[in-house]
Amino acid sequence: TNCLLGGIIKVIIEDSLIFIRDANEKLFVFDLNGKFRNMIGVMGNGPLEYTSLSDFYVNCQKKFVCILDRIKGKIYRYTFDGQYIEEFDCDRSVFNNVIDIHYVGENKLLLNMNNHIGTLYNYALVNESSYKLEQFLHPYPVVSRERISNGMLPTVVYGNGNIFYTVLLSDTIYTIQDGESRPIYLYEGGLKHINYEALQQETPYQSIFEAEMKLIKKGYSGGLLQLFQLKDHLYFEICQGEECWNIFWNLKEQTGFKYNSCLPGIRIFPGKVQTVYENYIVRS
């Protein structure tokens, strides 16, 4: 069988366009009807070609898309139609450890970082004009000996002028105001919140997830997982013991509701959430 796409890695919907990165290191653009429009960039070793599609992001305000080539240490910038604009050198000490790049307005990028011995922080705030580090955010309380991250799950949302993001092993949702990280919501699900003191009880750990599993058995929450912003709601997931909750929080009314998607024999929301569009959840 012939299939245009390989396995889907990352999806972003902006400006009525669907940007899809697949497992073959290609970046496709479709319209909202699913019609193919164009590719972004060309993979190769020649001029203006990227060697690796390590990640991508979309600047929804200035209407361009950028590809990170970790091998070359480059950021390639294109129009939504796939026309090359320019390229930038990026700070390898930062971008070599990034797993997910998010545009968060005001000429800023928020980078979700791997958790391992070479990276001590969950996030890096980067200037989009220079691709230089401005500051690291949220030191990891446990550093894994392997490359581990929650970056394969979408954990940062930006829309309607709002920035929300989650931190590994935390029940808190944060925002960025005046260049500073600030807590804005705390999910109370009846379990204890993981903190630094709790994590130090049984050190050392091989990985941060080993620490998580040990603390869950002691009655601690495993922290928030993926996070999205619908038209009026924040949508996020959290696993607490054997229960996995899908939670919808109305930003205007400051009320919410939740579903347990791990009831015996029932999976209410099957598949991985790739992105959202208005009030629709896109799963694969």
Spans of model-derived segments:
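Beta-strand-rich domains and repeat architectures in extracellular enzymes and scaffolds
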Residues: 1-25
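Blade-loop segments of beta-propeller domains
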Residues: 2-7, 35-62, 69, 92
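Short coil/turn segments at the loop-to-beta-strand junctions that recur within blades
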Residues: 3, 41-48, 90-97, 140-144, ...
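Repeated scaffold domains used in trafficking and secretory/extracellular systems
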Residues: 7-10, 51-56, 95-102, 146-154, ...
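Short beta-strand elements that form the blades of beta-propeller/WD-repeat-like
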Residues: 16-22, 63-69, 107-117, 124, ...
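Asp-box/WD-like beta-propeller blade repeats and closely related beta-sheet repeat scaffolds
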Residues: 50-53, 69-121, 135-145
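Loop-centered beta-sheet repeat module
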Residues: 124-180
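Conserved blade-ending motifs and adjacent loop-strand segments that build the rim/top face
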Residues: 184-216, 252-282
